[in-house]
Amino acid sequence: MKIQLLVLLPLVFLLSYRVEAQDARQIADKAGKAVEFDAMEMTATLTIRDGRGNERVRQIANASRKFGAVNKTLMKFLSPADVKGTAMLIIDNEDKDDDMWIYMPALRKTRRIVSTEKGKSFMGSEFSNADMSRPNLGQFNHKILGSATLNGKDCWKVESACLDEGIEDQMGFSRKVAFIEKTTYLTQQVEYYDFDGELFKVMTFGNYKKQANGKYFAFTMEMKNKQNGRSSTIAIDQFQLGSRLAEDYFSTATLEKQ
């Protein structure tokens, strides 16, 4: 009997680990679906603050639409003059790495953003290029760390650790911990940890508004760098559910049109 118990214990542990990992991924997946839109258009204000509180402000126009299993996003900077015309195209692929291109009007050239640049700063802000696209859950090991109350909301703490060093280099962090509200599956906050395991950045989501399709959209997002004191905020100025833009609009040719 004792021998049977010793044989069964590792199996029970393995099964419980698999169930926990599956549950954690399911929570992360539901959190993504809670804010997933097939099509939308919006304008937003990006505010970039340095460690002394000095601000730079950028106005952005953004359009996104899903074609089959692929989500395509095109954003253009409207102001100020030094960034006006800068544009980015993001192709969110379901089962492979995302594709990104950026057009710099000063160079009159469109170039591809390679995978090692996705964890780099998005236009000088504390957001990364990767933050502009939807996360690929298959690139992480997911684990429930427990529960926590954040701003009066009962949340799951779900850790997503990069599968390998290559993904760490691509993302710009080693792991992240998301605080996901249990009733709505809306992500309230995400903590990012650097390659040494130290807290790096914290992103908070606020002013969620329910749309006509039953999904929610966060009208404010803030990223705080805990290591250098800098922060950046994206505030949605106008939001439109749906889009009539054709698929050929989401192309590198459109990037270069002013």
Predicted regions and their residues:
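Positively charged n-region of N-terminal signal peptides that target proteins for export
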Residues: 1-6
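Bacterial N-terminal signal peptides
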Residues: 7-16
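Sec/Tat signal peptide C-region and signal peptidase I cleavage site
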Residues: 17-21
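Mature-chain termini and adjacent capping regions
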Residues: 22, 41, 46-53, 80-82, ...
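N-terminal mature ectodomain segment of secretory-pathway/periplasmic proteins
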Residues: 23-106, 110
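A short, amphipathic edge element
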Residues: 25, 56-57, 132-145, 197-202
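Short amphipathic beta-strand and strand-loop transition segments with alternating hydrophobic
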Residues: 62-65, 143-149, 206-208
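Gly/Pro-enriched, hydrophobic low-complexity segments
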Residues: 89, 99, 103, 109-113, ...
